[in-house]
């Protein structure tokens, strides 16, 4: 019985191009989510000030 040979994968160093592509894609995805979050907050703020200007809401507590 001879020792069986197991084919081991040859490990290579990191691929610079692959790392750049992955980093760019992740950065753009995170930036897009962040931008959408800010657009949503801006929309809510604009709606609040529009209602405040129309007089439909007030930030002053009415005293009875």
Curated annotation (Swiss-Prot):
Keywords for this protein: Membrane, Mitochondrion, Mitochondrion inner membrane, Transmembrane, Transmembrane helix
Lineage top rank: taxon: Eukaryota
Membrane-spanning residues: 15-34
Cell location: Mitochondrion inner membrane
UniProt name for this protein: Cytochrome c oxidase subunit 5C-2
Role played: This protein is one of the nuclear-coded polypeptide chains of cytochrome c oxidase, the terminal oxidase in mitochondrial electron transport.
Keyword Transmembrane helix: yes
InterPro entries: COX5C
One of the record's GO cellular component terms: mitochondrial inner membrane
Signal peptide: none
Record-stated family: Belongs to the cytochrome c oxidase subunit 5C family.
């Amino acid at each position: 019985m001879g020792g069986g040979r197991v084919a081991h994968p040859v490990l290579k160093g990191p691929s610079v191009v692959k790392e750049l592509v992955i980093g760019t894609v992740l950065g753009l995805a995170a930036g897009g989510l962040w931008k959408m979050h800010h657009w949503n907050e801006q929309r809510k703020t604009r709606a609040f000030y529009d209602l405040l200007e129309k007089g439909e809401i007030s930030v002053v507590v009415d005293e009875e």
